[in-house]
Design a protein with these regions (language model features):
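Membrane-interface loop-to-helix entry segments
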Residues: 4-12, 74, 124
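Alpha-helical transmembrane bundle and helix-membrane interface signal
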Residues: 19-38, 64
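Cytoplasmic-side transmembrane-helix entry/capping segments in multi-pass membrane proteins
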Residues: 96-104, 151
Length: 181
């Protein structure tokens, strides 16, 4: 129920910006990735959780105009966040950066279809987004040698596009509705 396609557009614009800006000095040495630790894991966790709480509120509150659908939006938002967290935890092998970006990947992906999907579809959407983020962030840094410091392209660009596809794919898994006679 978020602004439906803004994540994908923003992510792809960020990808273009990262390509134009180039790599940070010292990021690659002899063609190999040089590890640069995050400046503060506690601040990474705090920022992620502030975003999650705010995102949850934004998603649900933006559905208030849809009448009785806001409960479904709340459940779907939570399910996508759980799916993204679990997938990033498993695929990312307990890496704190992946663990804290996994729920955000799920949230980005569910924005397009939070009012359309069944909660199981939201869980699957979030899980695929979490795994997609881990794979794409790693490939971007290691294989393609593109220095996207925050992972904006994998998080918003790819997970946003995946969310748009999933919102169409999983719409048939809808909840039964009351018939108006």
């Amino acid at each position: 129920m978020c602004i439906r396609d803004r994540h994908g557009v923003g992510g792809w614009l960020a990808f273009a910006a990262v390509l134009l800006l180039g790599r940070r000095d010292g990021r690659y040495r002899d063609g190999r990735l040089v590890a640069m630790a995050p400046s503060s894991i506690p601040f990474l966790a705090l920022g992620s959780w502030v975003l999650i709480i705010g995102w949850f509120g934004f998603n649900v509150m933006s559905a208030q105009t849809l009448g009785s659908i806001s409960g479904l939006v709340a459940v779907n938002t939570l399910m996508a966040m759980v799916g993204g967290t679990l997938a990033a935890l498993i695929v990312g092998r307990n890496d704190p950066g992946f663990l804290h970006n996994g729920p955000l990947a799920g949230l980005v992906a569910i924005c397009a279809g939070s009012d359309l999907m069944h909660p199981v579809g939201a869980l699957v959407t979030g899980a695929i987004a979490g795994a997609l983020f881990v794979w794409a962030f790693t490939a971007t840094q290691v294989k393609w040698k593109i220095d996207d410091v925050l992972g904006v392209w994998p998080l918003h660009g790819l997970c946003g596009v995946w969310g748009g596809i999933a919102s169409v794919s999983y719409t048939h898994l809808t909840l039964p509705t009351k018939r108006i006679v």
